[in-house]
Regions:
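Pair of pore-lining "gating" transmembrane helices in MFS-fold secondary transporters
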Residues: 1-24
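Hydrophobic core of transmembrane alpha-helices in multi-pass small-molecule transporters
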Residues: 9, 78, 89-102
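Short amphipathic helix-loop junctions that connect adjacent transmembrane helices
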Residues: 20-35
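Small-residue (Gly/Pro/Ala) motifs that create kinks and tight helix-helix packing interfaces
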Residues: 23, 134-146
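Juxtamembrane helix-start elements in MFS-like secondary transporters
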Residues: 32-41, 124
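Residue-level signature of mid-helix packing/kink "hotspots" within the transmembrane helices
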Residues: 45-53, 135-136
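Conserved MFS/SLC helix-loop-helix module at the cytosolic interface between two early adjacent transmembrane helices
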Residues: 50-86
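Cytoplasmic helix-loop-helix junction between adjacent transmembrane helices
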Residues: 94-130
Length: 146
């Protein structure tokens, strides 16, 4: 279970690392505004939310692992697009692609599949803790590598 929590935490670290630095760099993108900053931050959650159920259903059909691996690859692709973006549009597209790598529901389903009922609460709490740890680490590491 620790490996799944680490996997989820690593993915969340990629999401959270941009939070403390994106506003600082918005002047580097022509025409970037507070509105576009909000869209850039929010588009990730929008695409993730829109794809949780379809990807969860897909994982019921083809298995959890292929969807998780595919989601991580999509997330990496989105990260590369966002990191190489020279315009606010490119940055927003990259963040949307990152969100399309939605694995949260599939990962939780895999945890549920792999744990007994008496250990499920502990497993879910471990994943929840990984989210908090990722957020804390991202607030420190993000600005250091920027």
């Amino acid at each position: 279970m620790a490996s799944l929590a680490s996997l989820y935490g690593f993915r969340m670290l990629g999401l959270f690392m941009v939070l403390p630095i994106l506003a600082l760099y918005m002047d580097d993108y022509p025409g970037f505004s507070p509105l576009l900053l909000g869209i850039c931050l929010g588009i990730y959650g929008l695409t993730q939310a829109a794809l949780q159920i379809p990807l969860g259903l897909l994982s019921d059909k083809i298995g959890r692992r292929p969807v998780i691996i595919g989601g991580l690859l999509v997330f990496v692709l989105g990260s590369l697009v966002a990191a190489s973006a020279e315009t606010s549009t490119g940055l927003i597209v990259g963040r949307a692609i990152q969100g399309a790598g939605a694995i949260a529901s599939t990962l939780m389903a895999l945890v549920s599949d792999l744990t007994s009922e008496e250990n499920r609460t502990k497993a879910m709490a471990t994943i929840g803790a990984s989210i908090g740890m990722s957020f804390m680490l991202a607030m420190i590491v993000g600005p250091l590598i920027a």
